[in-house]
Structure formats: structure tokens, C-alpha cells
Amino acid sequence: MKKILKISVFAAVVICLSAFLLIGCQSNKNLVATVNGTDITEEQLQEQLKTNAVFKEVISSHIDDIATPDYKEITLKRLDEQCPADRDKAIKKLVETAYFLGMDNSISKDEAEKQIKQQLDDLDAYSGQYDNVKVNREIMNEFFEKLSTTEEQYIKDSADSYIAMVNRQRMYNKFIEDENLVVDENNSDEVINEFEQYLDEQLKKADIVYYNS
């Protein structure tokens, strides 16, 4: 049951990774920001915006398969939040990724790649048994094709992003614990908003420099 649940939420995981996909690529020019010494370049930003656009296109084309009529609007709204087309919002996402990537006690890149590969392998293993898993596999295949990449390259490119995602979840869990919050379907959006406000406060304490471009 645990594994089935993990697979059913895989699309959400992929959205997170697509929003963080290119933070590992480095360049020495056209900086848009630095986060605790980590550079974010214009090249990264443009590639990120391209990735966001492709992923939104793929997800939107499968929206009837992955969301009930009642949840279509919510799903598309979250997709816009995770894969922004707006330049400033995309920079903010990359800044958050760099911040989380620099946290202590992170999992290793090897472990990140192993976990991503396991989730993709799970899609193959269960796509014949569950329709939602089959759709997720189709989404990933289409995503790879439109970005002209392979599954193997995606795993490597996404390792840093996955590490950042894991660290973000750790911070979220600690926030809930420290605030003694009980999260359910009735207050989940409210709690997420509270966490985002808390995260903004933490980012203000970081060494972040933005460059005009």
C-alpha cells in the first residue's frame, strides 16, 4: 500500500524536480543571483523557463487523465506555481533551490540518483496495474522527448534538485512539528501558506544577491 501511494503522488514529485532541474549547471557570466556563494546564471534561468513551459504543456495535455473535474483548477494552479512562466518567479524558485541545496546533512548525489531511478523503475513495474501510474510514465516519456533528453541524463541532471526537494520537505516537517500543527485536507493550503511565509523569513537571513539584467 505504501508503494502504491508513493507512485500515485509521483507526478507532484516530478513537478518539483522540473522546477529545479538546472541548478547544477554552472557558468561564469551573466549572473542573475548568488545564494550563499552559489551562482545562478541567465543561461540557467532561460533553460529553466524552457523546461517549465515544456512541463506545463505536457501536464496540461494530460489534465483529464490526472485530475478529476473538481481538482482540475487546483492542479493547474499548483502547476503554475511550481513551473512559473514569469521571470522573477522563476528566479525565486532557483534561489530557493540553491538555498535548500546548501543545507547541512543533505543526502549524497549518489543517493539522490538512486532514489529518482527507483521511482522511475516503479513506474515501469506498476504501469500495467494502475492507470494513474501508466499516465505518469507517459508524461515522463513525453517530457524527455520534448526536452531531447534521456532518462539517464534526467536522473543525473536532477540529483541536486532532488536533494533540495528533500531538504525542503525536512524543513516543512520541522516547521509543522515546531508549530504543533495537524495537517488535513481542510487546512493543508493554509499550512502551506504559513510555511511559505516562514521560508521567506529564512531566505532574508541568507546571503542572497540579485543582479539587474
Model-derived segments and spans:
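N-terminal targeting/tethering segments
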Residues: 28-158
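Short, low-structural-confidence N-terminal segments
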Residues: 1-81, 186-213
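Acidic/polar surface patches and capping/hinge elements
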Residues: 115, 140-164, 169-213
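Alpha-helical transmembrane segments
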Residues: 15-19, 94, 166-170
